[in-house]
Amino acid sequence: MKRVLIIDVLNMYLRSYIVVPSLSTNGQPIGGLVGTIKSLQKLARETKPDHIVFAWDGPNGSMKRKIMDKNYKEGRKPIRLNRAFHNLSEDEETQNKVWQQSRLMEYLNIMPVIQTILPEIEADDVISYITQMPYYKGWQKIIVSNDKDFMQLCDEETVLMRPVKKELLNKSRITEQTGVHPTNMALARAIIGDASDNLPGIKGAGFATVAKRLDFLSEEKTYTIDEVIEHCENSNSTLKFFSNVIEGRELVEHNYKMMQLYSPQMSIQAKTITKEAIENFEFTFNKTELIKMMNIDGFSDLNLSDLTAHMNRIAREN
């Protein structure tokens, strides 16, 4: 079975930016850049993919969901380095973060990897669309992200790799861990809410509670909000959970629209652009330019022999 890595690249980059302490030869932070490239090398070595796709959040990527909910993702703290660089002001640190991200795109551009970035579209929706593309039918799709949102996309061909947790999740393991089948994951999370996206849930509802009180969500059958409400209405239990879900129906419906990825929020045009970019991509690798860029950026001593070997293989086999 062929294999495609689908990487939530901003998730990976920001994690590296925060925790990787690498400095260039002139003393500037380059942890986001170096950490992401090293992560790519590790992933290529461990999974030996045939294709690699990096999905970026587009400019104003959250716009569609912010129109639906103005408080979406509000209250998030600014991303800052978790170590002190006394020579960088806050503005300089922000400029450095943006530069590293832009430079990372340039590095990826000289490798046989596909990058997608579309205005007003989040990477989550693009990743969902890619997993559903007929082009990749019969391939193993490995989504690389620490974001739990992608659990809902796992099926016979799609798995989720969460690097921080060091776990590879298929649909069976997700069901075992959470008590909820991926086909019902968005519904369960709509009840629970998502504090990281500023989406409050039903009071007193966590994964354990939802899995216990709505145990049918562990089935592969796709359940609806109507069926959940009906179950709660027919329950003889006096537990507040059931009445809270009934009273919070509008909140659950709203959260579901915000969270579900089964039907990605992409126009036909955006889907066509993504489809053509992937199907018509030319797989080339410029190792000489890679070495040149590493010298310029001050980390030429980094051993990327495994990465270059896999990039050569991908370019050759495609």
Question: Model-found features: residue ranges?
Answer:
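Non-catalytic nucleic-acid-binding/docking modules located in mid-to-C-terminal regions
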Residues: E46-W56, N71, G75-K77, P112-V113, ...
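Noncatalytic, basic helical substrate-engagement surface that gates or grips nucleic-acid strands
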Residues: K2-I142, F150-L168, Q260, Q265-N280
